[in-house]
Amino acid sequence: MKPTYQDALAYFGVSGAHPGGLTLTKFLLEQEKITEETTILDGGCGTGQTAAYIKKNYPCSVTGIDYHPTMVKRANKRFEKEHISIQLVQGSLEKMPFPSDSFDIILVESVLIFTNCKNSLAEIKRVLKPGGVLLLVEMTAERALYAMEHQNMCEVYGIEKVYTEKEWINLMKEAGFPKVEVTLGHSVFSHMMTGMEPEDEAIDTSVPVNMQLEGKLMDHSYILYTYGNIIGYRVYRASL
């Protein structure tokens, strides 16, 4: 089985592997009302960077879930090192081991596109409490892609589709979210001009050299610089 882009992120321990990184995450959280009663799920928590930040800066309950076993190990290691207690589950957004109506806020950063989006959104809606909020940061096509453009991106990331803003909104509405807002968004190139530099994107240099996985990260860079004017990201806020 060929290694995936996600395998590369896990192997090298890349944190904040989404546009804007932790800087953007902090901004999004500041817009929400978070109290001691708030329950937050970091969906696709990766190395645990976001979950750890929330736990250390807000008085709420935090849970993390990630499908990749290496990411779960890295997240646990982070939580132990930083002496914080966070419930962490290895599992898929498509079928989460949580009761219905469990969370007030679910934060998903550049993860949903790697799953069956319809199944994941249905599960997210199930585990959100009435009045709950989904904060979604996702790769978004600036226009309908040509066949070759779409194929190249899907092959690099191992995904089935790159959605436009309208398609993302339709997916969320079809999943039962009556209100979907786009609160922020840029193409890759226009984002570079904002000065919103991501925090802590350093890779784990202690792991052995793996040229195949390094190649996956290089493929990612190629996509960004080749198609940076036609792909980007959007922040979607979907509420129940």
Where are these regions (language model features)?
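Short, glycine-/aromatic-enriched active-site segment of Class I SAM-dependent methyltransferases
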Residues: 12, 139-159
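Conserved alpha-helix/loop element of class I SAM-dependent methyltransferases that forms part
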Residues: 18-36
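Class I SAM-dependent methyltransferase SAM/SAH-binding core
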Residues: 41, 47-95
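A short acidic, Gly/Pro-enriched loop at the edge of an enzyme's catalytic core
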Residues: 94-105
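A short SAM/SAH-binding and catalytic strip from SAM-dependent methyltransferases
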Residues: 105-117
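A short glycine-rich, Lys/Arg-flanked "PGG" loop and its adjoining helix->strand segment in the class I
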Residues: 118-133
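Short alpha-helix
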Residues: 160-176
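Conserved Class I S-adenosyl-L-methionine
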Residues: 182-240
